[in-house]
Amino acid sequence: MVDSNDDAFDGEKSKTQIKRELHALVELGERLTTLKADTLARLPLTDELRKALAEASKHTAHGARKRHMSFVGKLMRVQDLDAIHALLEQMDSSTRQYNERFHSLERWRDRLIDGNDEDLERFVNEYPDTDRQQLRSLVRHAQHEKARNKPPAAARKVFKYIRDLDELQRGLR
């Protein structure tokens, strides 16, 4: 008969669960090794872990790297993982937002160069601080370059102008 009063295992983690958690810590450590120094500086890490992450790039042999990453995983156990995950998620979402904004501005540039006056009017409605004459001039130069199969120097200027307007409108300048 099975004893239902096995209180010894209540609340304890299985060996498999512990291994999963340790593997997740090692994976998080691997991700931290890919971050730049200024990004790492923003994370709440102990000095010992910072040193271990800096040393991780020195280990190139598979076995040595695996051992060192296990050590990093061990050091990760005493870190504030919720804060680290929150900051990493915030960085990822800001990068995603930046990329989405960048692609949106690229689409505006392409529409203005390939488009007509309607696209220009839509752009001016969305960005009221636009110097219409300057934008028309930049777009016209970009269209001439495109027609002559020249390098897109004027298209870059159109993009820079659009980006500057966007930053001005969003209060980043």
UniProtKB/Swiss-Prot annotation:
Q: Where are the transmembrane segments?
A: none
**Major localisation:** cytoplasm
The answer on whether this UniProt entry bears the keyword rRNA-binding reads yes
| The keyword RNA-binding is assigned to this record | yes
Localization: Cytoplasm
For this UniProt entry, the molecular function terms from Gene Ontology, in alphabetical order, are:
ribosome binding; rRNA binding
**Record InterPro entries:** DarP, DarP_sf
Q: Which purpose does this protein serve, as stated in its record?
A: Member of a network of 50S ribosomal subunit biogenesis factors which assembles along the 30S-50S interface, preventing incorrect 23S rRNA structures from forming. Promotes peptidyl transferase center (PTC) maturation.
Q: Which family does it belong to?
A: Belongs to the DarP family.
What is the protein name for this chain? Answer: Dual-action ribosomal maturation protein DarP
Recorded source organism is Pseudomonas putida (strain ATCC 47054 / DSM 6125 / CFBP 8728 / NCIMB 11950 / KT2440)
Upper lineage = Bacteria, Pseudomonadati, Pseudomonadota, Gammaproteobacteria, Pseudomonadales
Which gene does this sequence derive from? darP
